[in-house]
A protein has these predicted regions:
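Conserved Walker A/P-loop ATP-binding site and its immediately adjacent core
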Residues: 75-95
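Post-DEXD/H (motif II) to motif III coupling segment of the RecA-like Helicase ATP-binding lobe
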Residues: 151-209
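Conserved segment of the helicase C-terminal RecA-like domain
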Residues: 346-376
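A short beta-strand element within the Helicase C-terminal
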Residues: 308-311, 317-332, 338-345, 355-360
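Walker A/P-loop
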Residues: 45-66
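Conserved pre-motif I regulatory segment
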Residues: 7-52
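Conserved interdomain linker/interface between the two RecA-like ATPase lobes of SF2 helicase motors
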Residues: 189-259
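Conserved helicase ATPase core of P-loop NTP-dependent helicases/translocases
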Residues: 105-114, 270, 280-312
Length: 424
């Protein structure tokens, strides 16, 4: 196959004019921008580049500055894709802060004025419909940016941009589907600043992780490779698990602003009733809530010091509340990406906050290792995802390594015995 390489004018961050809009960029963000433009300058027109940076590292800020610089130096347009409408609006807002005039392509958007814009922001499904209807002119799109690129919903749109440079950004370069590895759709991965470095340099809060062993052998793995909602609800709504949740909360989180993640709406409602009956300030949020309800709940959560918010999936991406002090994983997951997304919601740093607590009630810590583990090699995971996934321990293997401690009241009955053990 004949590949045409177009050489472009080099763009370095330090060569550009001083910005009067946007946010101040940190040195690691400037370095990432330089690396990305270096690839852009020396790669084929249709090169697909993936950039990894942890949640809280400022991916949106980085690609917004990239868009600003790109539009200044190239007579082409930019398209930014997201997988949720909330992210569309947030992305559009940040781009505007950087002085980038942009148009959100949603189901209600009129396209009569599309020629007046050089940057578009669109949700993947809406964009797919508009492109199949031939209602959006993409003939002049030179740069495509994909936020949360690990989601597979974006891959069906690549056929429309066969002559565009594609930049995918993600915190976890591991595809949401085993059948569609990211290495099939991206030519190269650039790994950004690590979680440990961001913590060391006071850009992220550190996580104090507490794991409570849970028997998970009753859980069923579904077609998507993760535990089914039905089997999770059966386990996490039983009295034993609800009691364990309350005990863990009282032991580690009592009086702290806490975000609880569940796998299933019924589980979250059970959790809501559990804490409400105990006299705690608690709210429940899932994807059936209206925009108004969601806004009111999140405003309440923000301003209430010791609030508890129990949720289902909806807050794993696009949610930024730095005042969160504790995260409870009241679920198990086989997804490394979801594990990092959930914990990342507590990692925003504040003047009086440099750490947060994580309660794991799904053996996720044992499955994936500590959040920000230096043992994670993102380049290897990107290139050989199956090798990584095959190395993740099964629930049976995890539970066989558990060490059970005898409760103090029972141990006191054998106070004259030096060595005591029991089998469960």
């Amino acid at each position: 196959m004949h590949v045409v390489i177009q050489f472009r004018m080099p763009i370095k961050f330090q060569d550009t004019e001083e910005k009067t809009t946007g946010k101040n960029l940190y040195s690691y963000q400037k370095g990432a921008i330089d690396k990305i433009f270096e690839r852009f300058e020396n790669s084929p027109n249709d090169y697909h580049l993936l950039y990894q940076l942890p949640t809280g590292g400022g991916k949106t800020v980085i690609f917004s500055e990239i868009v600003r610089q790109y539009l200044k130096h190239h007579n082409k347009k930019v398209l930014v894709m997201t997988h949720r409408i909330e992210l569309c609006k947030q992305t559009s807002s940040v781009l505007s802060e950087f002085g980038v005039l942009n148009k959100v392509i949603d189901s209600k958007a009129k396209l009569d004025d599309q020629n007046e814009f050089s940057c578009f922001v669109a949700m993947v499904e809406t964009l797919n419909n508009r492109l199949n209807d031939d209602k959006l002119d993409i003939s002049d799109i030179g740069l495509v940016i994909i936020d949360e690129a690990h989601y597979n919903s974006f891959t069906k749109l690549f056929k429309f941009f066969s002559k565009s440079f594609v930049l995918g950004v993600t915190a976890t370069p591991l595809s949401s589907s085993i059948e569609l590895p990211m290495t099939d759709n991206y030519d190269e991965l650039i790994v950004g600043e690590s979680i440990q470095d961001l913590i060391k340099n006071e850009f992220l809060a550190s996580a104090n992780m507490y794991s409570f062993n849970v028997g998970l052998t009753s859980l069923v793995i579904g077609a998507n490779g993760d535990y089914t909602v039905k089997s999770s609800e059966d386990l996490y709504t039983n009295n034993e698990m609800l009691s364990k949740l309350m005990e863990a909360y009282k032991e580690r989180c009592d009086g702290k602003k806490t975000l609880i993640f569940n796998n299933g709406i019924n589980t979250s409602l059970f959790v809501y009733d559990l804490f409400r009956s105990a006299g705690y300030q608690v709210a429940h949020l899932d994807n059936t809530a209206s925009k108004k309800e969601r806004t009111l709940i999140l405003e309440w959560f923000k301003k209430t010091p010791n609030a508890i918010l129990t949720s289902v999936s909806i807050l794993t991406t696009g949610f930024d509340e730095p005042t969160v002090e504790s995260i409870i994983l009241n679920r198990a997951t086989k997804s490394l990406t979801l594990y990092y997304q959930m914990i990342g919601r507590g990692s925003r740093i504040l003047k009086n906050k440099n750490s947060f607590d994580v309660i794991d009630l799904g053996n996720n810590f044992h499955r994936f290792g500590p959040w920000g583990s230096t043992n994670l090699d993102w380049q290897r995971i990107f290139k050989y995802p199956n090798y990584y996934l095959d190395g993740v321990l099964s629930d049976e293997d995890l539970e066989s390594n558990f060490i059970y401690q005898m409760p103090d009241d029972i141990r006191s009955s054998f106070k004259n015995s030096k060595d005591v053990y029991f089998d469960i």
